[in-house]
Amino acid sequence: MDAWVRFSAQSQARERLCRAAQYACSLLGHVLQRHGASPELQKQIRQLESHLSLGRKLLRLGNSADALESAKRAVHLSDVVLRFCITVSHLNRALYFACDNVLWAGKSGLAPRVDQEKWAQRSFRYYLFSLIMNLSRDAYEIRLLMEQESSACSRRLKGSGGGVPGGSETGGLGGPGTPGGHLPQLALKLRLQVLLLARVLRGHPPLLLDVVRNACDLFIPLDKLGLWRCGPGIVGLCGLVSSILSILTLIYPWLRLKP
């Protein structure tokens, strides 16, 4: 199995390039349709998108083994929340790839009796569950980092003898004893949390990249499952952005979120 995992890893770059091209075609097709391009040109773009999708399915054959190996490694993580989110995400990815393999067999003619609509819905359902777990993991890591950053800021303020912004020692408008002061205090706390979030994400590019990539990918299964119709333009744009970010993590491995 290890040999197969290494082999499938070598095809990741080609698969992600095909993915970027596929969603670029989806976006281009939407733009051409909006601008009244010739039906023949639109048909060619749709055919190219379909060929790229089928090619990606071929490149993903056996990726279930890679996902299962990743799940086996994640089981040994010491953090319970990370262990749960990452393991469940990889297991859903394995099921997604398995459904994708069945779809490839149906589209390529090897299994013509396959109900492609049913298997496509199954694959997107597992894909959606995987993305939800990924975003849950991102939210958990962000919360941990924000708590660490907040504690560090508090220690620095205590060391310098400064007060905590928006604390009980602040008087005047917005103080706890001032009528209507709770709303300004809430706004100040919210602003501080947003600034803290921005600082955390700016200081951790892999986490920022992972959040944006998963958020972009989320639109794809939501649209395909009919849970939130975004349209081919939004799906194409989000898929293209996500694919470019995935390619960046291959070119620059330090941008990949670990574990």
Swiss-Prot record:
It holds the Pfam family PEX11. Keywords: Acetylation, Membrane, Peroxisome, Peroxisome biogenesis, Transmembrane, Transmembrane helix. It comes from the Eukaryota. The modification N6-acetyllysine is found at K43. One of its GO terms (biological process) is peroxisome organization. It is a single-pass membrane protein. Its main location: membrane. The chain crosses the membrane at residues 234-254. It is found in: Peroxisome membrane. GO terms for cellular component: peroxisomal membrane. Signal peptide: none annotated. Residues 211-259 are annotated as: Interaction with PEX19, PEX11G and FIS1 and peroxisome targeting. InterPro entries: PEX11. Involved in peroxisomal proliferation. May regulate peroxisome division by recruiting the dynamin-related GTPase DNM1L to the peroxisomal membrane. Promotes membrane protrusion and elongation on the peroxisomal surface. PANTHER family: PEROXISOMAL BIOGENESIS FACTOR 11, PEROXISOMAL MEMBRANE PROTEIN 11B. Belongs to the peroxin-11 family. Homodimer. Heterodimer with PEX11G. Interacts with PEX19. Interacts with FIS1. This is Peroxisomal membrane protein 11B. It comes from Pongo abelii (Sumatran orangutan).
